[in-house]
Amino acid sequence: MQITTNIASIRTHIPQGVTLVCVSKFHPMEAIMEAYECGERDFGESRVQELLPKYEALPKDIRWHFIGHLQTNKVKQIVPFVHMIHSVDSVRLLETINREAEKIQRRVKVLLEVHVAKEETKSGFSPEEFLSLASSPNSLIASSPNSLNEASYPWVEICGVMGMATNTDDESEWRRCFRAIASLASHLSPLASSPNSLIASSPIAYSSPSERPQISMGMSDDYLVAIEEGSTMVRIGSTIFGFRTSKL
């Protein structure tokens, strides 16, 4: 019942319009089902080899979010069912997702991962790389279409950005990171017409029912600050499921 209690507590702090992604990586299916019985449907996993058996065994109305580093050779295993890939950190990965999605004729939702934290170990486009793609599409190599728009990647639905704050207890540093992520998200523009249109209104365009980019930021320690700074999607694990003592 602890998971039920934890979710109820967290829900009191999450406003309408912010999606709670329950980060279930390294946690057993029984724990996921307890959260599911509370009404949760969005779950986050970071390893393909762990996600696949969970997808096969658990209810099919679960929306699976892939939040970890994704190797290009594993993309084809999750594109048939994944709800959203949060961790697109390179044009090469975006190209692979588009190619595999086209094979099965299924558009895949993604977020572009941006790196604003102080740790060099974190992945993602640097702010400079992100803004370069947004503002200078003509400088990109024509033989390998790298401008992040619907015309280049018709089978990828760019929904927004994802990022992480520096691993610190300093709230001011959290805010710096979250404001930087939200600022980068503001450089995304909605599609010119329908979500299926191949004409984008900017080099980096997103397709979102709410006509605003999704901003996936905030975890167990800092999600309240992230929400204050504009997060539309928080990824919470240990505060729901407890700390993981060992990997599955």
Question: What are these language model-derived features?
Answer:
Residues 232-233:
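Divalent-metal-activated hydrolytic enzyme cores
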